[in-house]
């Protein structure tokens, strides 16, 4: 895991929002590489935002990236609006720019990545959301490079 001092190189936090858990990843604009960081395992908004505030204080990101889910055909579903609301709250509470990124298939890709690494079952469940956040953030970085 990178050190908190990485913020001087353009630290970015990425989020895979879920109603029960939020996966968090970290990366740097300079390197363009995302890493899984942590899973926030709380349903209550006050606990979620307290955990996020701690991460923002520790890592001092210059911006945030939030995955925006949709159906494969691009149509939005119920979680899409919740993610938009989450992104607006992040921007309002922390006064940081928030970029929404298409997250179709991020959880499936994360699960595949973990299986290829020999991680399955309960262990996979404990890190799946942060690896999905890693895929979302990496997608953002890859979009900048193209």
From Swiss-Prot:
- What GO molecular-function term can you cite, just one? nuclease activity
User: Per its UniProt record, what Pfam families does this chain match?
Assistant: RuvX
Xref: InterPro entries: RNaseH-like_sf, YqgF, YqgF/RNaseH-like_dom, YqgF/RNaseH-like_dom_sf
Q: What class of enzyme is it?
A: hydrolase
Might you report a single GO cellular component term? cytosol
Q: Where is it localised?
A: Cytoplasm
This protein's UniProt keywords: Cytoplasm, Hydrolase, Nuclease, Ribosome biogenesis
User: What EC number(s) does this enzyme carry?
Assistant: 3.1.-.-
Q: Name one GO biological process term.
A: rRNA 5'-end processing
Membrane spanning residue stretches? none
Q: Which SUPFAM superfamilies match?
A: Ribonuclease H-like
HAMAP family, sorted: Nuclease_YqgF
Q: Which family does it belong to?
A: Belongs to the YqgF nuclease family.
| Role summary | Could be a nuclease involved in processing of the 5'-end of pre-16S rRNA.
Name of this chain's protein: Putative pre-16S rRNA nuclease
